[in-house]
Amino acid sequence: MNGNPISSTAISVQMAYQYYIENKFIVNRKYQRKLVWTMEEKAAFIDSLQKFYSVPLFLFANKNIEGVTSFEIIDGMQRLNAIMAFIENEYPIKTSDGEYRYFDLETLSSTKSAMDNGEIIQRTPKLERQLCVNITNYPLPFSFISADEKSIEDIFRRINSYGRQLSNQEIRQAGAIGLFPELVRKVSCIIRGDVSPHDQLKLNEMKLISLSNKRLNYGIVMEDIYWVQQHIITIPNMRVSRDEELIAWILSYMIMGEQVSPTSYTLNKLYKYSISDDENLSTKIEAQIEHLGSTTIQQWFSSIHSFIIDILD
């Protein structure tokens, strides 16, 4: 390898699915956003595979967890989920005859076994077997990197900053270290209802805490989230983490008062914590959070939020 920390190869969809059911794909919630693709976006990606169109690179960080090799997803989480969800019959794709058809579970031995065991139910009408074979044989461009956590988070930020795939708030929050970003994450999760016991999750666990809608039988139904119910934030804006941006503004004002203003420029400063600059706004808010206590501030926010809900109800 000549010291090169990056390796690239083509992995078939079938092999990628095998990695998936072996829980080799890991998601780090410190920088990864939620699963936000709609059924239409997922189906469009599967259609690209069916037509053998070129697709973007999937990027992973090599990890060794308790002696087991796994791959932390840096870029490609939404696409990977689209593949796995389609294979497991969570949604159909539209075919040339105008019908919406589901993956034939008998195409792969692993899905056939899961169907026989009652773990997956075959939905109908089924997609033609040969088309399913074509999809599972598609060579996905996988790239693996060996790097420390700080470098991985930096790579994620750069990919999504230059590609404009994430919103400003998602980029701010991606891998941000400090009491303030962590407080925003925790409070946002509590309000949405997607709290998880730890930051690293298996890819197949992500759908349980991801933003969904009434057509999908899993996740957090966005229509039921406080911000959407009260017409404060629209569903499209929930998908790009505007709720976290709003909570960041509220928390910063609760903690710092009139020292902060509700602007993107201020939020950018709050998320760039630097212990070497005592005059830095992010340093000041970190010191104030440490003084007041993250748990105390979280309780303040939750109490006020509960009071508002009681009034509205």
Can you say where each PLM-predicted feature lies in the sequence?
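Basic- and aromatic-enriched surface patches that contact anionic nucleotides/nucleic acids
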Residues: 2-7, 11, 32-38, 43-256
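C-terminal subdomains that position terminal phosphate/3'-OH groups for nucleotidyl transfer/ligation
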Residues: 242-313
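Acidic, carboxylate-rich catalytic segments that either coordinate divalent cations
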Residues: 1-17, 301-312
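Conserved aromatic/hydrophobic "specificity hotspots" at molecular recognition or selectivity sites
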Residues: 20
